[in-house]
């Protein structure tokens, strides 16, 4: 097995500076009615980098980035990289316990923020806007400190089997390699990208860096959980031509607003895969090309692409395609030798995109990144086979990692979080097919007393520990967990009983008499969205198993049926039909406030 030809890759600041010189006064970023050109963005990032150096940041310093979506986020991110710092993104929408865990694991001496302080006592928090103002008069030329493509650019935290997030160290070369890419997926300077993915996830590298390093325009969505009308309006209003969407959200968008795709030239389906009927409609609506894409954090995101055809849909098998330049895909058997076409083995990745490893986890790094015949590789944990044309088709997972709404989730991390709640004795999580064709998590548990736990209390505890995409849709209490003939847990024997919500004493919940017509309508719409029985007006949406995509769908249904525009994040915050009904009344009276 031979190594790939060497790919000359610069650092991210060097690649961005080249793109900025070529783009000049073209718009780089748009956010609402505000915009910034490439020339302005580069100069602002240079001034910010120099301010950071005066604050004591040195090449190799790890700095947290704890910000909401705004133009200043990108100035800060690029400025940090120009100062030679390692960027550690913190998602403000994640539970504070998750963010504090990242601060602790990454050992962050400094965190830049535009959100309220008080994240953690182990990091110094500085306001980004104050630092920008303090550096406004500094030299706006590049400090030229970041020149080694092998140096660490980002540490991105992913789901881990140990029950705590693990940091993936990503080198500049891993992301900057896309600067020289213009192959199967063509990026034009007149393209307009939509920045949808959270910047703390590897999927955002396509939205941010594939665009900026080619001089394209990036439209930043104010929310990572947009309503469907808002998403469609943004695509049309700003003339978005390049869309990178998870499959579940694509399903909802083509159902509700097929016209949004009318002028989109390129669509990349990433994360989870859309249903074949939805995909066929997207392919018909898009005047350009729809691609199936594969990527993972350990290979700095975008890895392989495949232009989808009607024949793919007829066969029911869509390859992830061929690797990007500088990337190798290898399907290997147990003896670590290449499998013949059609033979199933584990997919491995080699090349310029490989991460440096896991932060502080040398043994896990060695196991995940083996050297095979002198070539460093990544074991993806995906069963795969190659086609006669050399493309790779995924056929399953080798471990307990699953994809939920486009995010990779270790089932063990969810189980450990439930065990730590103190409400269950033992928890086991399975991924099952949902009514919308996506995957969802179901938690099975036992208790020391044999009595069912409070489902709402358990889910509330999990919500404080885990991101929303890792929350189980349903919880089932069992007298005991099934075991096989060897006395080991038999996951496949776990079956869902008929869905009945239970109180802590094990009795079925009694639904209150509903007299609020708006709340009643909300529960009925939620039942349609989730494919389950209507819940009570005071029951938690979270406890009923509603996920972020279903909340977006509920917001769209409320718009269609009741003529009100409810933000998905407000639905998450209010969390029951009774409170949401009050909010809807306030909206109808012209008030935007979310009731406490």
Swiss-Prot record:
Pathway note: Antibiotic biosynthesis
Q: Which CDD domains match?
A: A_NRPS
**Domain remarks in the entry?**
Contains a A-domain and a T-domain. The A-domain is responsible for selection and activation of a substrate, which is then covalently tethered to the T-domain.
* Protein source organism: Streptosporangium sibiricum
Q: What is this protein called?
A: 3-hydroxy-4-methylanthranilate adenylyltransferase
Top-level taxon in the UniProt lineage: Bacteria
GO cellular component assignments: cytoplasm
Looking up InterPro entries in the UniProt record yields:
AA_adenyl_dom (IPR010071), ACP-like_sf (IPR036736), AMP-bd_C_sf (IPR045851), AMP-binding_CS (IPR020845), AMP-dep_synth/lig_dom (IPR000873), ANL_N_sf (IPR042099), PP-bd_ACP (IPR009081), Ppantetheine_attach_site (IPR006162)
* Keyword line: Antibiotic biosynthesis, ATP-binding, Nucleotide-binding, Phosphopantetheine, Phosphoprotein, Transferase
Which catalysed reactions does the entry list for this protein?
3-hydroxy-4-methylanthranilate + ATP + H(+) = 3-hydroxy-4-methylanthranilyl-5'-AMP + diphosphate
- Keyword check for Nucleotide-binding: yes
Recount the PTM note.
4'-phosphopantetheine is transferred from CoA to a specific serine of the apo-form of this carrier protein.
Question: What NCBIfam families is this protein classified in?
Answer: AA-adenyl-dom
EC number(s) per UniProt?
A: 2.7.7.97
The record's annotation in Pfam families points to: AMP-binding (PF00501), PP-binding (PF00550)
Spell out the SUPFAM superfamilies in the cross-references. Answer: Acetyl-CoA synthetase-like, ACP-like
Which Gene Ontology BP terms does the record give?
amino acid activation for nonribosomal peptide biosynthetic process; antibiotic biosynthetic process; secondary metabolite biosynthetic process
Q: Which Gene3D superfamilies match?
A: 3.30.300.30, ACP-like, N-terminal domain of ligase-like
């Amino acid at each position: 097995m031979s190594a790939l030809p060497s790919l000359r890759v610069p650092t991210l600041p060097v690649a961005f500076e080249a793109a900025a010189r070529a783009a000049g006064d073209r718009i780089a970023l748009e956010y609402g009615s505000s915009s910034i050109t490439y020339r302005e963005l580069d100069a602002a990032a240079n001034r910010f980098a120099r301010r950071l150096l005066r604050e004591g940041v040195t090449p190799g310093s790890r700095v947290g980035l704890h910000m909401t979506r705004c133009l200043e986020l990108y100035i800060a991110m690029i400025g940090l990289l120009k100062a030679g710092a390692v960027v550690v993104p913190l998602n403000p929408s994640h539970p504070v316990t998750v963010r504090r865990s990242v601060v602790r694991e990454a050992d962050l001496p400094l965190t830049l923020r535009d959100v309220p302080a008080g994240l953690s006592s182990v990091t110094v928090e500085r306001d980004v806007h104050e630092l920008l103002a303090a550096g406004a008069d500094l030299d706006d030329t590049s400090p030229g400190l970041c020149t080694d493509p092998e140096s660490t650019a980002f540490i991105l935290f992913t789901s881990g089997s140990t029950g705590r997030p693990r940091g993936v160290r990503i080198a500049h070369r891993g992301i900057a390699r896309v600067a020289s890419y213009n192959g199967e997926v063509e990026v034009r300077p007149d393209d307009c990208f939509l920045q949808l993915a959270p910047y703390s996830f590897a999927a955002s590298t396509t939205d941010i860096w594939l665009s900026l390093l080619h001089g394209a325009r990036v439209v930043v969505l104010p929310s990572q959980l947009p309503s469907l009308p808002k998403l469609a309006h943004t695509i049309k209003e700003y003339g978005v031509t390049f869309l990178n969407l998870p499959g579940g959200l694509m399903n909802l968008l083509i159902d509700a607003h097929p016209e949004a795709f009318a002028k989109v030239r390129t669509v990349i389906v990433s994360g989870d895969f859309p249903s074949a009927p939805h995909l066929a409609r997207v392919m018909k609506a898009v005047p350009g090309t729809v691609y199936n894409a594969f990527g993972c954090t350990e290979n700095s995101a975008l890895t392989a692409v495949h232009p989808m055809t009607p024949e793919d849909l007829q066969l029911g098998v869509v390859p992830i395609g061929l690797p990007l330049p500088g990337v190798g895909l290898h399907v290997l058997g147990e003896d670590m030798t290449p499998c013949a076409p059609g033979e199933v083995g584990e997919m491995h990745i080699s090349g310029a995109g490989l991460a440096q490893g896991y932060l502080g986890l040398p043994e896990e790094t060695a196991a995940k990144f083996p050297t095979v015949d002198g070539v460093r590789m990544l074991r993806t944990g995906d069963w795969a086979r190659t086609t006669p044309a050399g493309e790779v088709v995924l056929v399953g997972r080798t471990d307990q990692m699953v994809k939920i709404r486009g995010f990779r989730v270790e089932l063990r991390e969810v189980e450990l979080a439930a065990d730590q709640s103190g409400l269950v004795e033992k928890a086991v999580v399975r991924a099952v097919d949902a009514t919308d064709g996506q995957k969802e998590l179901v938690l099975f548990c036992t208790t020391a007393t044999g009595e069912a736990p409070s489902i709402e209390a358990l889910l509330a505890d999990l919500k404080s520990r885990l991101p929303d995409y890792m929350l189980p849709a349903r919880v089932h209490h069992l007298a005991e967990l099934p075991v096989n003939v060897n006395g080991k847990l038999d996951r496949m024997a776990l079956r869902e009983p008929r869905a009945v919500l239970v109180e802590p004493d094990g009795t079925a919940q009694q639904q209150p008499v509903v007299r609020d017509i708006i709340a009643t309508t909300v529960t009925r719409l939620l039942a349609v969205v989730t494919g389950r029985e209507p819940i009570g007006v005071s029951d938690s949406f979270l406890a009923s198993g509603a996920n972020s995509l279903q909340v977006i769908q509920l917001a769209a249904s409320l718009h269609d049926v009741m003529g009100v525009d409810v933000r998905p994040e407000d639905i998450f915050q209010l969390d029951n039909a009774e409170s949401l009904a009050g909010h809807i009344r306030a909206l109808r009276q012209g008030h935007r406030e979310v009731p406490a």
